[in-house]
């Protein structure tokens, strides 16, 4: 999917991500999610905008389920708990602010391995 020199990182079974670029205040990645995969509830300090490039998934926030399909986007404020259920294979472009330094550290370790 991405021509980025960064490695693909397996996040969970059926979910992997790849850093596209980062800057002083923003970070962008692409995620591939297989149908039936699940990202458990979590939260992070970063604001997040996700744009579904292909496929369909369900974003779960505050107990509510929101289906999001190719061509649609969603916004998550800082520290909002959320989870994801993947309905069909999906590719998602995620942008975070500030950058995901935790993801960048994993990228650096993978490159040096």
Label the model's feature ranges.
Residues 1-25, 105-113:
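A short, N-terminal "cap"/entry segment at the start of jelly-roll beta-barrel domains
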Residues 29-43:
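Conserved short histidine dyad/triad with adjacent acidic residue
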Residues 38-39, 55-60, 74:
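Short beta-strand segments in beta-sandwich/barrel cores
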Residues 46-57, 62:
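Glycine- and acidic-residue-biased ligand/ion/polar-headgroup-sensing regions
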Residues 53-54, 69-70, 88:
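A cytosolic small-molecule/anion-sensing beta-strand core signal
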Residues 56-58, 65, 81, 91:
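Structural motif
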Residues 63-78:
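Short acidic-glycine-tyrosine-enriched beta hairpin
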Residues 78-102:
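Ligand-binding loop in jelly-roll beta-barrel domains
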């Amino acid at each position: 999917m991405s021509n980025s020199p960064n490695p693909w990182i397996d996040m969970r079974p059926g979910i992997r991500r790849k850093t596209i670029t980062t800057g002083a205040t923003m970070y962008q990645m692409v995620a591939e999610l297989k149908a039936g995969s699940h990202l458990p509830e979590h939260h992070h300090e970063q604001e997040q905008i996700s744009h579904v490039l292909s496929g369909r998934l369900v974003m779960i926030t505050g107990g509510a389920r929101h289906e999001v399909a190719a061509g649609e986007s969603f916004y998550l404020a800082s520290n909002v708990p959320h989870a994801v259920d993947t309905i069909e294979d999906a590719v998602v472009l995620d942008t975070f602010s500030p950058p995901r330094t935790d993801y960048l550290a994993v990228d650096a370790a993978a490159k040096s391995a």
